[in-house]
Amino acid sequence: MEKLVIATRRSQLALWQSEYVKSRLLEHYPNMQIELQEFVTKGDKILDVPLAKIGGKGLFTKELEVAMLEGSAHLAVHSLKDVPTQFEDGLMLAAVTKRFDPRDAFLSNKYTSLEELPKGAIVGTTSLRRRMALKILRPDIELKDLRGNINTRIAKLNAGEYDAIILAATGIQKLGIENEVKYFSPISTDIMIPSMGQATLGIETTNDPKVLEILKVLNDNNAHIESTVERSFVDTLQGGCQVPIGVKATILDENSIRVQAIVGMPDGSEYISEDITADIEDYETIGQNLAQIFIDQGAKELLEKAEKVAFK
């Protein structure tokens, strides 16, 4: 193929990620012409309503998928955490890139950490998963919705609307804006378990064999194993991108993999959590088996309850 078109969202972070993928491809195919085709997704347009209340899956991927199915783009670059576990007919996950920093991060101009926040402090986040974790850790703080791109969210913090905000560490690090706030502190996954696929890029495409062959060079085996476990866990629970589920698989060595997972209510009042170590050779079934342990403890009923609360 002489020309490859990458569908991407228009945000600064999405463009960084697509340029990163473009540069990786050019390392292997220096003579290939690669273009970016920019889109504004439904999730980008609706900034005054928490994502959980919008509902549905693929809020940040649908428009890019349409472009691929219609033939105007060959692939799309997504934050893997935004990619639903089930694909439209004719589409598939072709590769997952090397994982960046998977942790969430604490940002503040007043306090160095979650522990230092005073009672009643206002913390900005819209993610139901982060809300759940924060309320489990600090039931005495106040949570306030936070939408917009990374720069908008930091601007709101700097304007004094929040005492602290929680964002994905990788986005801040990719854009090199850690110093735009006084305190930037990644949070251990032992305290706040990330979303499935967090800090990994998912490369989606059609089943065109020529394109699939080209995209093989982007796949990172460790990220593939970890994200397979995480996505299988969420898929078995039938949880979308906007419900309070955290899951993080971490390869420990050539034989074993650790999986941390949590499911619960957005207010932290009820939750189920597990932290297991399994044989890495079973990575294709670990997520499903762990999800079944959660289901046996009432996870599906808990998620249904959480969804009703979130969509009110």
Curated annotation (Swiss-Prot):
Family: Belongs to the HMBS family.
S-(dipyrrolylmethanemethyl)cysteine modified-residue sites: 241
GO biological process, any: protoporphyrinogen IX biosynthetic process
Aminoacyl-tRNA synthetase as UniProt keyword: no
Cofactor binding: number and manner: Binds 1 dipyrromethane group covalently.
Protein name: Porphobilinogen deaminase
Subunit and interaction comment: Monomer.
Involved pathway(s): Porphyrin-containing compound metabolism; protoporphyrin-IX biosynthesis; coproporphyrinogen-III from 5-aminolevulinate: step 2/4
Lineage, top ranks: Bacteria, Pseudomonadati, Campylobacterota, Epsilonproteobacteria, Campylobacterales
Keywords: Porphyrin biosynthesis, Transferase
Cellular component annotations (GO), alphabetically ordered: cytoplasm
Disulfide bridge map: none
Main function: Tetrapolymerization of the monopyrrole PBG into the hydroxymethylbilane pre-uroporphyrinogen in several discrete steps.
Gene coding for it: hemC
MF annotations from Gene Ontology: hydroxymethylbilane synthase activity
